[in-house]
Amino acid sequence: LYKDILKISVTRPILSIFLVGLLIVGSYTAYFSAKLGVQFFPDIEPEQAVVQILSRGDLSASEKNSLVKDTEASISNLNGVDINFAKTGADGRTKDLVGSVRTIFSDWDERETAADLMESMRGSVKFLEGANINIVAQKEGPGGQGKPVRIEITGTDFDQLNKALFVIRQKMNKIDGFIDISDNLPSPGLEWNLNIDREIAARHGVTVASLGTMVKLLTKGVKVSDYRPDDTDEELEVFLRYIKSERNLDRLQELRVPTSDGRYVPLSVFAELTPEKKGGTISRLDGNRLRSIEANVKEGMQAPFLIEKLKSEIENVTFPKSVSVNFAGEDEDIKETQAFLGQSLVFSLVLMSIVLMIQFNSAWQTIVTMSAIILSTGGIFLLLFLTERPFGVVMSMLGLIALAGIVVNNNIVLIDTFNEYKRKGHNHREAAYMAGLTRFRPVILTAITTILGLVPMVFSLTIRFSERDILVGAPSSQWWVDLSSTIAGGLTFATFLTLIATPALLVIGRTSVFSIKNKLVTLLKTKLSTKTVST
């Protein structure tokens, strides 16, 4: 069969290359029309998750503890939840955090998938009033533990930033796929400001520092001494403050402050207590004020795909000129990684081209050798289309860089054999035909051994010799599926097409060279004859 195909390839090389190109374009079209998107890093089955309990507003310690206990009780009885560690209190990083429950799952082969289990957890805690629940799965690989979608809104005016934030959140709520949406808007609440009239205070001989000391008596207290008990080497700090029942705003107004002439004057003479809206933490990015939105993505959906939908939704929204919207998170990571690995791929291709040019001393044969890389990309996208997997920016790109160094070996062998037959006196068609037949078995066997070695990783197989069993889909094997699939798919596709396309390209190269040479000779003869006649 291969003899017949090879004969057609060398006798009709242009038709053969056209059909090969059509097949590659078809694989590209099939993949991109399926809109499978891209993926920054493989989704590894997590072994644990953190349930974050968030609540806006001031809650007492007992109310916070009650929310955490209710959350822990709701998820403890779910099948697949092994151990829970509950903690009440903020962590200093997450805004509005009341507490958290760290959940360790059962073994992956004894429960449903983590995505289904986390969905059950969301359903079990949705009845909790006054709380917003975020469930964050353990994340492997680069990208940190943050949410994959992050939108940064920067500007100079908080009112404009808040309006833009509300508009974008409304758009996100309408798009199916965004979950656990949160932002960095300050929690609603009041804060009391003590406005001191410095002129009146100075008239009574009262300093701002002394006023601050008196106010501390009603808040955290004033340090008056240090005390070291006999049974310890560490000193204890002694603070003085009012009893709990006296620590209130009314008492603050009645607080008497000593003056320079020995009198005690109410604090209200020097200061006015005014309520104001709580401002919260002011975040900045590159000197501009920042509002941010973060979100998780539903299982089975890709963050870049949802971000593109959101971008199209907000294209028609007119924001003030001072407001800038930037998509960070996984979208930013993908762009940076693509740029870095893309440069690495180009650099490796340039190095290989230089080595091949020195080896073959022929630009055309170097181009033919490097064409195997283009052929391999068709196999990569065809396999991704058939398996309905997104293109992995990290692992698939690394696989492509590794594949580039593997697939050119077949062409090097074919072209080297082709040149050997040429030196023996065969013409281009005969040399290309005989090179294909001679090297068919070595090329196929080399490719098969490589592909078979990758099969366990492609199908996520884990062979446990001590247990005498084979596991499918273990978390440890999920790391390498994209990398191995890229190499195996590209090598399979490129190997068979190389055995057809390379002989055809070698014939086309010779034909093209003769055609160009004949045209140049004819043109020169015409000019010379014209000059002779005119003379």
Q: What feature does the model see in each segment?
A:
Residues 1-39, 151, 527-535:
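Signature of alpha-helical transmembrane segments and their immediate interfacial
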Residues 37-109, 118-123, 158-191:
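Extracytoplasmic/periplasmic
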Residues 28-30, 47-57, 97-109, 143-163, ...:
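Short, hydrophobic beta-strand segments
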Residues 169-348, 352, 357-360, 388, ...:
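Extracytoplasmic/periplasmic membrane-proximal domains and adjacent transmembrane bundles
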Residues 21-58, 110-112, 145-148, 458-470:
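Transmembrane helices with small-residue packing motifs
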Residues 26, 62-144, 199-220, 228, ...:
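Solvent-exposed, membrane-proximal periplasmic/extracellular interface segments of envelope transport
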Residues 2-13, 37, 41, 72, ...:
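Alpha-helical membrane-interface segments at transmembrane helix boundaries
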